[in-house]
Amino acid sequence: MDIPISLTVNGKSVTKTVDSRTLLVQFLRENLQLTGTHVGCDTAQCGACTVHMNGRAIKSCSMLAAQVQGSQITTIEGLAKNGELHPMQAAFRECHGLQCGFCTPGMVMSAVQLLADNPKATEEEIREGLDGNICRCTGYHNIVKSIQFCQSGAKASA
């Protein structure tokens, strides 16, 4: 059954009609062409699909698009402002917090939430905060380093 939904995505009002079974991640990727949100496991285990809903990190593969009616959604594409990377995105680039890049959008979205909740997070707290995100390439060292770089307020080189 098709249903209408209205929400705000990356600061823009969106009204679409979707199948009631459409997952939020499918809606973002297929209806809005926001392909930075990745589908990894499709079971809310890997975190590749992490986006922010009303300022909180969620796994978009575990929510129906209809469940976000009236919400504000921010995807990885919505973090950058006026052509400038978000400080966390810049930190990941600066500190080589990625290899293949598949997990990076979800990792960045989770990291932004992590520091919003705990700006003075220790390395252990950062590692615990990334618990819901899986990276098969990096071993997490440079991911943690990236988050600490952002946390320090240091500016990434251009």
Which residue stretches match the model-derived regions?
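Signature of N-terminal electron-transfer/Fe-S-associated modules in redox systems
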Residues: M1-A158
